[in-house]
Protein backbone atom coordinates (compact mmCIF):
# COMPACT_ATOMS: atom_id res chain seq x y z
CA UNK A 1 0.00 0.00 0.00
CA UNK A 2 1.36 3.40 -1.06
CA UNK A 3 1.33 6.45 1.15
CA UNK A 4 -1.16 8.20 -1.18
CA UNK A 5 -3.76 6.54 -3.40
CA UNK A 6 -5.47 8.42 -6.22
CA UNK A 7 -8.29 6.87 -8.25
CA UNK A 8 -9.74 6.24 -10.78
CA UNK A 9 -7.50 6.04 -13.81
CA UNK A 10 -10.25 7.20 -16.18
CA UNK A 11 -13.27 9.44 -15.69
CA UNK A 12 -16.16 8.27 -17.88
CA UNK A 13 -18.96 10.59 -19.00
CA UNK A 14 -21.99 9.17 -20.79
CA UNK A 15 -24.40 10.61 -23.35
CA UNK A 16 -26.07 12.98 -23.65
CA UNK A 17 -22.84 14.92 -23.51
CA UNK A 18 -24.64 18.20 -24.08
CA UNK A 19 -25.83 18.08 -20.47
CA UNK A 20 -23.97 18.58 -17.21
CA UNK A 21 -22.78 15.46 -15.39
CA UNK A 22 -20.54 14.69 -12.40
CA UNK A 23 -17.92 12.04 -11.72
CA UNK A 24 -15.69 11.59 -8.66
CA UNK A 25 -12.00 11.14 -7.97
CA UNK A 26 -10.82 9.94 -4.56
CA UNK A 27 -7.60 10.82 -2.74
CA UNK A 28 -6.61 8.62 0.21
CA UNK A 29 -3.85 9.57 2.66
CA UNK A 30 -2.32 6.37 4.03
CA UNK A 31 0.67 8.13 5.62
CA UNK A 32 1.08 9.42 9.16
CA UNK A 33 1.36 13.11 8.14
CA UNK A 34 -0.96 15.61 6.55
CA UNK A 35 -0.78 16.08 2.80
CA UNK A 36 -2.05 18.77 0.46
CA UNK A 37 -3.28 18.22 -3.10
CA UNK A 38 -4.07 20.27 -6.15
CA UNK A 39 -5.94 19.29 -9.34
CA UNK A 40 -5.05 20.66 -12.79
CA UNK A 41 -6.80 20.03 -16.12
CA UNK A 42 -6.08 20.53 -19.81
CA UNK A 43 -9.65 21.77 -20.48
CA UNK A 44 -10.64 24.21 -17.73
CA UNK A 45 -13.54 25.60 -19.80
CA UNK A 46 -15.40 22.26 -19.77
CA UNK A 47 -14.83 21.10 -16.20
CA UNK A 48 -15.28 22.35 -12.67
CA UNK A 49 -13.35 20.66 -9.82
CA UNK A 50 -14.53 20.91 -6.21
CA UNK A 51 -12.33 21.21 -4.27
CA UNK A 52 -9.43 21.76 -6.63
CA UNK A 53 -6.99 22.17 -3.71
CA UNK A 54 -7.28 21.02 -0.09
CA UNK A 55 -5.61 19.23 2.83
CA UNK A 56 -6.02 15.49 3.60
CA UNK A 57 -5.37 14.34 7.16
CA UNK A 58 -3.60 11.02 7.92
CA UNK A 59 -5.90 8.03 7.20
CA UNK A 60 -8.50 10.26 5.53
CA UNK A 61 -10.04 9.94 2.05
CA UNK A 62 -11.52 12.89 0.14
CA UNK A 63 -13.96 12.67 -2.76
CA UNK A 64 -13.30 15.32 -5.38
CA UNK A 65 -16.18 16.31 -7.67
CA UNK A 66 -15.24 16.61 -11.33
CA UNK A 67 -18.21 18.32 -12.98
CA UNK A 68 -18.47 18.09 -16.76
CA UNK A 69 -20.22 21.26 -17.98
CA UNK A 70 -21.39 19.77 -21.29
CA UNK A 71 -20.69 20.36 -24.98
CA UNK A 72 -22.59 22.58 -27.38
CA UNK A 73 -23.47 19.57 -29.56
CA UNK A 74 -23.16 15.81 -29.41
CA UNK A 75 -19.82 14.54 -30.77
CA UNK A 76 -19.44 11.86 -33.43
CA UNK A 77 -19.46 8.18 -32.48
CA UNK A 78 -15.75 7.79 -33.19
CA UNK A 79 -14.76 10.91 -31.26
CA UNK A 80 -11.90 10.38 -28.81
CA UNK A 81 -11.62 12.74 -25.88
CA UNK A 82 -8.11 13.88 -25.04
CA UNK A 83 -8.92 15.79 -21.87
CA UNK A 84 -6.78 14.95 -18.86
CA UNK A 85 -6.45 15.76 -15.16
CA UNK A 86 -3.30 15.88 -13.07
CA UNK A 87 -3.56 15.34 -9.30
CA UNK A 88 -0.46 16.44 -7.33
CA UNK A 89 0.07 15.76 -3.62
CA UNK A 90 2.71 17.28 -1.34
CA UNK A 91 3.53 16.88 2.36
CA UNK A 92 1.98 19.61 4.48
CA UNK A 93 3.45 19.27 7.99
CA UNK A 94 2.95 22.91 8.90
CA UNK A 95 -0.11 24.66 10.17
CA UNK A 96 -1.48 26.84 7.38
CA UNK A 97 -2.95 29.31 9.89
CA UNK A 98 -6.25 29.43 8.06
CA UNK A 99 -4.69 30.11 4.66
CA UNK A 100 -5.99 28.36 1.57
CA UNK A 101 -3.86 25.65 0.00
CA UNK A 102 -3.83 27.55 -3.30
CA UNK A 103 -2.22 30.52 -1.55
CA UNK A 104 0.65 28.49 -0.03
CA UNK A 105 0.99 25.93 -2.80
CA UNK A 106 4.03 27.59 -4.37
CA UNK A 107 5.84 27.51 -0.99
CA UNK A 108 5.00 23.83 -0.42
CA UNK A 109 6.06 22.93 -3.93
CA UNK A 110 9.38 24.73 -3.56
CA UNK A 111 10.16 22.90 -0.30
CA UNK A 112 8.71 19.41 -0.91
CA UNK A 113 8.87 19.08 -4.67
CA UNK A 114 11.03 15.93 -4.50
CA UNK A 115 8.42 14.21 -2.29
CA UNK A 116 5.52 15.01 -4.58
CA UNK A 117 3.19 12.21 -5.69
CA UNK A 118 1.15 12.83 -8.83
CA UNK A 119 -1.22 10.91 -11.07
CA UNK A 120 -2.80 11.56 -14.46
CA UNK A 121 -6.48 10.80 -14.93
CA UNK A 122 -7.86 10.48 -18.46
CA UNK A 123 -11.36 11.33 -19.67
CA UNK A 124 -13.53 9.10 -21.85
CA UNK A 125 -16.85 9.81 -23.54
CA UNK A 126 -19.40 7.00 -23.88
CA UNK A 127 -21.47 8.13 -26.84
CA UNK A 128 -24.82 6.43 -27.34
CA UNK A 129 -25.67 5.60 -30.98
CA UNK A 130 -29.30 6.60 -30.40
CA UNK A 131 -28.31 10.24 -30.09
CA UNK A 132 -26.82 10.61 -33.58
CA UNK A 133 -30.00 10.49 -35.71
CA UNK A 134 -31.34 13.51 -33.85
CA UNK A 135 -27.99 15.20 -34.24
CA UNK A 136 -27.98 14.53 -37.99
CA UNK A 137 -31.45 16.02 -38.26
CA UNK A 138 -30.29 19.12 -36.44
CA UNK A 139 -27.31 19.42 -38.75
CA UNK A 140 -29.57 19.16 -41.81
CA UNK A 141 -31.92 21.77 -40.38
CA UNK A 142 -28.98 24.07 -39.76
CA UNK A 143 -27.81 23.58 -43.33
CA UNK A 144 -31.29 24.43 -44.63
CA UNK A 145 -31.32 27.61 -42.63
CA UNK A 146 -27.89 28.56 -43.92
CA UNK A 147 -28.78 28.12 -47.62
CA UNK A 148 -31.22 31.08 -47.79
CA UNK A 149 -28.51 33.30 -46.30
CA UNK A 150 -26.20 32.42 -49.18
CA UNK A 151 -28.97 33.17 -51.69
CA UNK A 152 -29.70 36.51 -50.06
CA UNK A 153 -26.07 37.51 -50.30
CA UNK A 154 -25.93 36.92 -54.08
CA UNK A 155 -28.25 39.80 -55.14
CA UNK A 156 -25.86 42.20 -53.45
CA UNK A 157 -23.85 42.13 -56.68
CA UNK A 158 -26.71 43.84 -58.59
CA UNK A 159 -25.87 47.39 -57.46
CA UNK A 160 -22.39 46.92 -58.88
CA UNK A 161 -23.89 46.21 -62.34
CA UNK A 162 -26.18 49.21 -62.07
CA UNK A 163 -23.27 51.45 -61.24
CA UNK A 164 -21.38 50.20 -64.28
CA UNK A 165 -24.32 51.22 -66.48
CA UNK A 166 -24.55 54.62 -64.90
CA UNK A 167 -20.90 55.48 -65.56
CA UNK A 168 -21.18 55.67 -69.41
CA UNK A 169 -24.15 58.05 -69.00
CA UNK A 170 -21.79 60.98 -68.43
CA UNK A 171 -20.12 60.91 -71.91
CA UNK A 172 -23.60 60.99 -73.55
CA UNK A 173 -24.19 64.50 -72.21
CA UNK A 174 -20.86 65.80 -73.53
CA UNK A 175 -21.61 65.91 -77.34
CA UNK A 176 -24.33 68.62 -76.99
CA UNK A 177 -21.90 70.76 -75.03
CA UNK A 178 -19.29 70.48 -77.76
CA UNK A 179 -21.85 71.47 -80.44
CA UNK A 180 -22.72 74.61 -78.53
CA UNK A 181 -19.08 75.57 -78.28
CA UNK A 182 -18.63 75.13 -82.04
CA UNK A 183 -21.65 77.33 -82.84
CA UNK A 184 -20.32 80.31 -80.91
CA UNK A 185 -17.24 81.17 -83.04
CA UNK A 186 -19.14 81.61 -86.37
CA UNK A 187 -21.41 84.23 -84.76
CA UNK A 188 -18.42 86.18 -83.58
CA UNK A 189 -16.76 85.95 -86.96
CA UNK A 190 -19.85 87.30 -88.71
CA UNK A 191 -20.26 90.25 -86.40
CA UNK A 192 -16.62 91.27 -86.58
CA UNK A 193 -16.58 92.01 -90.32
CA UNK A 194 -19.68 94.28 -90.03
CA UNK A 195 -18.09 96.27 -87.27
CA UNK A 196 -14.88 96.61 -89.24
CA UNK A 197 -16.80 97.76 -92.32
CA UNK A 198 -18.64 100.38 -90.30
CA UNK A 199 -15.44 101.59 -88.78
CA UNK A 200 -13.73 101.80 -92.18
CA UNK A 201 -16.75 103.53 -93.74
CA UNK A 202 -16.88 106.06 -90.94
CA UNK A 203 -13.17 106.61 -90.92
CA UNK A 204 -12.70 107.13 -94.73
CA UNK A 205 -14.30 110.64 -94.98
CA UNK A 206 -11.97 112.05 -92.36
CA UNK A 207 -8.84 111.99 -94.52
CA UNK A 208 -10.65 113.69 -97.48
CA UNK A 209 -11.83 116.64 -95.37
CA UNK A 210 -8.44 117.06 -93.87
CA UNK A 211 -6.87 117.12 -97.34
CA UNK A 212 -9.29 119.82 -98.53
CA UNK A 213 -8.69 121.99 -95.50
CA UNK A 214 -4.96 121.56 -95.84
CA UNK A 215 -5.18 122.58 -99.52
CA UNK A 216 -7.11 125.80 -98.84
CA UNK A 217 -4.74 127.02 -96.15
CA UNK A 218 -1.65 127.23 -98.42
CA UNK A 219 -3.67 129.03 -101.13
CA UNK A 220 -4.71 131.77 -98.78
CA UNK A 221 -1.18 132.16 -97.47
CA UNK A 222 0.21 132.45 -100.98
CA UNK A 223 -2.30 135.16 -101.98
CA UNK A 224 -1.60 137.27 -98.91
CA UNK A 225 2.15 137.03 -99.39
CA UNK A 226 1.88 138.05 -103.04
CA UNK A 227 -0.13 141.17 -102.10
CA UNK A 228 2.47 142.20 -99.58
CA UNK A 229 5.25 141.65 -102.09
CA UNK A 230 3.52 143.85 -104.66
CA UNK A 231 3.01 146.65 -102.15
CA UNK A 232 6.65 146.57 -101.12
CA UNK A 233 7.73 146.71 -104.75
CA UNK A 234 5.51 149.71 -105.40
CA UNK A 235 6.88 151.53 -102.38
CA UNK A 236 10.43 150.97 -103.57
CA UNK A 237 9.57 152.34 -107.00
CA UNK A 238 7.94 155.45 -105.52
CA UNK A 239 10.83 156.15 -103.20
CA UNK A 240 13.30 155.73 -106.02
CA UNK A 241 11.41 158.21 -108.21
CA UNK A 242 11.51 160.86 -105.49
CA UNK A 243 15.22 160.56 -104.82
CA UNK A 244 16.09 161.14 -108.48
Swiss-Prot record:
Superkingdom classification of source: Eukaryota
Record note on what altering residue 86 to D does: Disrupts binding to FFAT motif
Cell compartment(s), UniProt: Endoplasmic reticulum membrane; Nucleus membrane
InterPro entries for the chain: Ig-like_fold, MSP_dom, PapD-like_sf, VAP
One GO CC term on file: nuclear envelope
Disordered, as annotated region: 135-219
Basic and acidic residues biased stretches: 153-168
Modified residues (N-acetylserine): 2
Membrane topology label: Single-pass type IV membrane protein
Cytoplasmic side, ranges: 2-222
Residues the record lists as Phosphoserine modifications: 106
Residue ranges, compositional bias (Polar residues): 199-211
Domain notes: The MSP domain is required for binding to the FFAT motif of target proteins.
PANTHER family attached to this UniProt entry: AT11025P-RELATED (PTHR10809:SF6), VESICLE-ASSOCIATED MEMBRANE PROTEIN-ASSOCIATED PROTEIN (PTHR10809)
Subunit field text: Interacts with OPI1. Also interacts with PBI1. Interacts with EPO1.
Biological role stated in the UniProt entry: Acts as an endoplasmic reticulum (ER) membrane anchor for cytoplasmic proteins via binding to the FFAT motif of targeted proteins. Regulates phospholipid biosynthesis by modulating the subcellular localization of the transcriptional repressor OPI1. Also contributes to the tethering of the ER to the plasma membrane.
Protein name: Vesicle-associated membrane protein-associated protein SCS2
Organism from which the protein derives: Saccharomyces cerevisiae (strain ATCC 204508 / S288c)
Amino acid sequence: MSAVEISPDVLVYKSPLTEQSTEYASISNNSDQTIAFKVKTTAPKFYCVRPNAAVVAPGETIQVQVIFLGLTEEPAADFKCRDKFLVITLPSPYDLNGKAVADVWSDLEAEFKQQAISKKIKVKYLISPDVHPAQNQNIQENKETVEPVVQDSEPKEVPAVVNEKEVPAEPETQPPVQVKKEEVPPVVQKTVPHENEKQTSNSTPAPQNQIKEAATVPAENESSSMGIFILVALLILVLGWFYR
